[in-house]
């Protein structure tokens, strides 16, 4: 018998301010990879993390 897939998946978090902000320290978009449990957290994740491009803590949202 085959084992079922695990509940944990790898997701990518992207800075929300990098897309619209033109006065940044450096060009580009900040992205972090992390894991989430699909069964416990069904909605999209949003975490405040440090963005090296904006040089401050910003909201990072889960992208596909």
From Swiss-Prot:
GO annotations of cellular component type: cytoplasm; ribonucleoprotein complex; ribosome
InterPro entries noted in UniProt: Ribosomal_bL33 (IPR001705), Ribosomal_bL33_CS (IPR018264), Ribosomal_bL33_sf (IPR038584), Ribosomal_zn-bd (IPR011332)
PROSITE patterns: RIBOSOMAL_L33
Keywords: Ribonucleoprotein, Ribosomal protein
Biological processes per GO annotation: translation
GO function terms (MF aspect): structural constituent of ribosome
Disulphide bonds in the chain: none
Matches recorded under SUPFAM superfamilies: Zn-binding ribosomal proteins
Keyword Ribosomal protein: yes
Family named by the database record: Belongs to the bacterial ribosomal protein bL33 family.
Name of the protein in its database record: Large ribosomal subunit protein bL33
Taxonomic source organism: Synechococcus elongatus (strain ATCC 33912 / PCC 7942 / FACHB-805) (Anacystis nidulans R2)
